[in-house]
Swiss-Prot record:
Protein name (database record): NAD kinase
Pfam families: NAD_kinase, NAD_kinase_C
Family: Belongs to the NAD kinase family.
Tagged with keyword Translocase: no
Primary gene name: nadK
């Protein structure tokens, strides 16, 4: 068994944890390799470019927050990912720093379980070539710096759903429902639900609401505007500036992400903990 390790190099505590992890693995004679930027910060030559890690390892370890895990998952493809939370919220990162070594031991002895998460596949023309872009959380088309409110045209399986005057459109998986979509007013969806959610960003009409659809649907989105260019983001990464009337097609990807599960956590507990549900808030009093 060989691990590929990806570290959020902007966090000193993540780098410190990576050093401790390397020592722990060395003591047990377990093979590992760092992603190149992580290795540079840790001053080790045991590294490979992120694009090549998949062919050098059997599993990935992500040391950071949800953003680091999203980044790692794109290169892990179907190989298992152990997400260790060294960030803030940590919806996707299953393990605390204190739980990291136990999680790795379970992977080593084959006693771990896997959470399989669906992804989105966005088909778009880039440099005159059809490209397939994967996203674990969401695909987002925004108005960007466009000075007016554009109209987003959405079709489901070729049939017109509606046209939205809005600042953007979020298409999210159940995994991504607690990310940007939730901030824009979208519903929270349990992880194993076979659905997607389409969430408008700041729609011009109050009657416009997010819609939950089957993940078997094929979604087509285009921007109706006389000019301008519109950012297409997959999991927060800019992939292309869309032209007016240019369409993208979003469907369920044939590739799923495999996250190593923390059997000591359940989804309801995560929601209560991360979103502070059921807690009394003391905002203080105003002196008269």
């Amino acid at each position: 068994m060989k691990f590929a390790i990806v570290v959020n190099v902007t966090r000193q505590n993540a780098l410190d944890l990576a050093r401790n992890l390397a020592l722990w693995l060395d003591e047990r004679k377990v093979a590992y390799i760092f992603e190149s930027l992580s290795a540079e910060k840790l001053q080790t030559d045991n590294s490979a470019p992120i694009e090549e890690l998949n062919k050098h390892c059997d599993a990935f370890i992500s040391l950071g927050g949800d953003g680091t895990l999203l980044f790692t998952s794109h290169y892990a493809v179907t190989k298992p990912v152990i997400g260790v939370n060294v960030g803030y919220l940590g919806f996707l990162t299953e393990f605390t720093q204190a739980e990291m070594f136990t999680a790795i031991e379970r992977v080593l002895n084959g006693s771990n379980t896997i959470h399989t998460r669906s992804q989105l596949d966005a088909t778009v023309l880039i440099d005159n070539e059809v490209q397939h872009l994967r996203a674990l959380n969401d695909v987002v088309i925004e108005k960007g710096a466009y000075p007016r409110i554009p109209t987003f045209i959405i079709k489901l399986d070729g049939e017109l759903l509606s046209s939205y005057r809005a600042d953007g459109i979020i298409i999210a998986t159940s995994t991504g429902s607690t990310a940007y979509s939730m901030s824009a007013g979208g519903p929270i969806i349990a992880p194993k639900s076979s659905v997607f959610v389409i969430t408008p960003i700041c729609p011009h009409m109050l009657t416009v609401r997010p819609i939950v659809i089957s993940d078997e649907k094929i979604i087509e989105v285009s921007v109706d505007a006389p000019d301008g260019s519109f950012p297409l983001n997959c999991d927060g990464n800019l992939k292309k500036m869309l032209d007016p009337q240019e369409s993208i097609t979003v469907r369920k990807s044939t590739v799923a992400i495999n996250l190593v599960a923390n059997e000591n956590r359940d989804y309801c507990e995560i929601l209560r903990t991360k979103l502070l549900w059921g807690r009394e808030h003391n905002f203080g009093t105003i002196d008269s």
